[in-house]
Amino acid sequence: MYKFEVFKDKAGEFRFRFRASNGEIMFSSEGYKAKASVLNAIESIKKNSPGAETVDQTTATV
């Protein structure tokens, strides 16, 4: 099962990481001073990402 994990880093900031069902970390967040802020970021991703497009910025445009 995919999951978000909330944790505190060495600087005391709240962060999250997103893990795949095989345990691999797929991405992680920036640091947040408040736990409520990191939880809001997770909810925003859940709400807004289902229709997100993929933009390949590695291709050259002329």
Swiss-Prot record:
The keyword Lipid biosynthesis does not apply. This is UPF0339 protein Atu5359. The lineage of its organism: Bacteria, Pseudomonadati, Pseudomonadota, Alphaproteobacteria, Hyphomicrobiales. The keyword Kinase does not apply. SUPFAM superfamilies: YegP-like. Keywords: Plasmid. Pfam families: DUF1508. Belongs to the UPF0339 family.
